[in-house]
UniProtKB/Swiss-Prot annotation:
The gene is SAMS2. Keywords: ATP-binding, Cobalt, Cytoplasm, Magnesium, Metal-binding, Nucleotide-binding, One-carbon metabolism, Potassium, Transferase. NCBIfam families: metK. Signal peptide: none annotated. Induction: By salt stress, in stems and leaves (at protein level). Follow a circadian regulation with higher levels in the light. Belongs to the AdoMet synthase family. Its cofactor is Mn(2+); Mg(2+); Co(2+); K(+). ATP binds at residues 19, 171-173, 239-242, 250, 256-257, 273, 277, 281. It comes from Atriplex nummularia. This is S-adenosylmethionine synthase 2.
Length: 396
C-alpha cells in the first residue's frame, strides 16, 4: 500500500472481569441465569452496585425459581478472584444487601398479558432502539480495535488465574488504537498504533517487571505480529501504581460498560444495557437479533460493512422500524437488503427468544457479562450464528 494513502486512527477500550462495573454486570447476569435455569418464564430486571466491602442487588424479579441471591453474589465475586480485602473485595466477608421486588403488574399485563399470550404476541418490554453492526475486517466480522482490546483484557485474566503472572490482581483496563484505511466505506486495518494496559498488581512487583511480563505474556500472544512495528507505542501501567483496585478503588454499577459490551465505539448504540435483563427486554434481545442480521449480511457477501437498527414500543410485538446502512459497500441497494432482512428475521421479542434460544439459563448470560457479547466463538452465543440470505449477484 502506497505511503500516501489517507489513514485515520480509531480507538477502542475494554475492561476485564475484575473491574467494579463488570463485577456488577456479572452478578446481575448470574442472578438472571439462576432464575431462568429454574423458570424460563422469569421476568428479571436485576441491578447491582458495589463499593468497598459492600455489594447490593436490587430490582424487579418475578419468578417461580427459588434463588439464594446472597450465595450468587459471593460465588460470583469469589470466581473472579475477589477473595480478600487487599485485592479489592472479600467475597466471604463483604456485606451483601438484597432489595428485590416483583415486576410492576402494569408492565406485566402490557407486555405478556400475565403469561396468557402466545410467543408471537408477546410485546416489547419497553420502548427503545437497538443497533447491530458487522465489518469484514476480522474473522469474527467485528472491529479490530474492539477485538484486540477485548482479547487483551481476557488474556490478562487468563495469566492471572493460571499463575503465569502471580503479581496480577483482578482489576484492569485495556485500550487499543488502530490505524485504518477507508476503502470505499469498508474499514481496512493497517497497523496497531498504540497499546495501553493498566492492570491492578500486588506490592511486590516493579514497573519494569510489569511492562516486561505484559509484553511477553499478554500482548505478544494476542496481537498478530503483522500489526506491530517499531513505531507502535506501548503505555503499560502509565500511572505508575495500581495496587488498590476493584470496588475498593472505584464504585461499580451494572450497565456502565455498554460500548465495551458491543462494538468498541463503532456502529451505534441505542443506550440500553444488557446485563440482568431477561429476553422480553428488547434492549438485550433486540440488540442480539440486530447483530445476527448485520453479521449475516456481511457473511453473505451482500456488504463489507453494515449497521442495522430496530425500534420498539412497549407492549407492541412488531418493531416500529427496521433500518439498514451498508456505508456504500453493498452489492445491491440498501433498500433491497432491507427487504431480504425483513423476510429472513422475525423481530418480535417472543420469537427472538425462541429462535435464539434465549430462555435458557445455566451460566449462559454470565459468560456474556465480561469480554463482549458479540464476536465470540461459543455455542451459547446463538446470535453469532449466520443465517443464509437469499440474493442474486447483479449482472456485470
Amino acid at each position: 500500500m502506497a505511503a500516501a494513502v489517507d489513514t485515520f486512527l480509531f480507538t477502542s477500550e475494554s475492561v476485564n472481569e475484575g473491574h467494579p462495573d463488570k463485577l456488577c454486570d456479572q452478578i446481575s447476569d448470574a442472578v438472571l441465569d439462576a432464575c431462568l435455569a429454574q423458570d424460563p418464564e422469569s421476568k428479571v430486571a436485576c441491578e447491582t452496585c458495589t463499593k468497598t466491602n459492600l455489594v447490593m442487588v436490587f430490582g424487579e424479579i418475578t419468578t417461580k425459581a427459588d434463588v439464594d441471591y446472597e450465595k450468587i453474589v459471593r460465588q460470583t465475586c469469589r470466581d473472579i478472584g475477589f477473595v480478600s480485602a487487599d485485592v479489592g473485595l472479600d467475597a466471604d466477608n463483604c456485606k451483601v444487601l438484597v432489595y428485590i421486588e416483583q415486576q410492576s403488574p402494569d408492565i406485566a399485563q402490557g407486555v405478556h398479558g400475565h403469561l396468557s399470550r402466545r410467543p408471537e404476541e408477546i410485546g416489547a418490554g419497553d420502548q427503545g432502539h437497538m443497533f447491530g453492526y458487522a465489518s469484514d475486517e476480522t474473522p469474527e466480522l467485528m472491529p479490530l480495535s474492539h477485538v484486540l482490546a477485548t482479547k487483551l483484557g481476557a488474556r490478562l485474566t487468563e495469566v492471572r488465574k493460571n499463575g503465569t503472572c502471580p503479581w496480577l490482581r483482578p482489576d484492569g483496563k485495556t485500550q487499543v488504537t488502530v490505524e485504518y484505511y477507508n476503502e470505499n466505506g469498508a474499514m481496512v486495518p493497517i497497523r496497531v498504533h498504540t497499546v495501553l494496559i493498566s492492570t491492578q498488581h500486588d506490592e511486590t512487583v516493579t514497573n519494569d517487571e510489569i511492562a516486561a511480563d505484559l509484553k511477553e505474556h499478554v500482548i505478544k500472544p494476542v496481537i498478530p505480529e503483522k500489526y506491530l512495528d517499531e513505531k507502535t507505542i506501548f503505555h503499560l501501567n502509565p500511572s505508575g501504581r495500581f495496587v488498590i483496585g476493584g470496588p475498593h478503588g472505584d464504585a461499580g454499577l451494572t450497565g456502565r460498560k455498554i460500548i465495551i459490551d458491543t462494538y468498541g465505539g463503532w456502529g451505534a448504540h441505542g443506550g440500553g444495557a444488557f446485563s440482568g435483563k431477561d429476553p422480553t427486554k428488547v434492549d438485550r434481545s433486540g440488540a442480539y437479533i440486530a447483530r445476527q442480521a448485520a453479521k449475516s449480511i456481511v457473511a453473505a457477501g451482500l456488504a463489507r460493512r453494515c449497521i442495522v437498527q430496530i425500534s420498539y414500543a412497549i407492549g407492541v410485538p412488531e418493531p416500529l422500524s427496521v433500518f439498514v446502512d451498508t456505508y456504500g459497500t453493498g452489492k445491491i441497494p440498501d433498500k433491497e437488503i432491507l427487504k431480504i432482512v425483513k423476510e429472513t428475521f422475525d423481530f418480535r421479542p417472543g420469537m427472538i427468544a425462541i429462535n435464539l434460544d434465549l430462555l435458557k439459563g445455566g451460566s449462559r448470560y454470565l459468560k456474556t457479562a465480561a469480554y463482549g457479547h458479540f464476536g465470540r466463538d461459543d455455542a451459547d452465543f446463538t446470535w453469532e450464528t449466520v443465517k443464509p440470505l437469499k440474493w442474486e449477484k447483479p449482472q456485470a
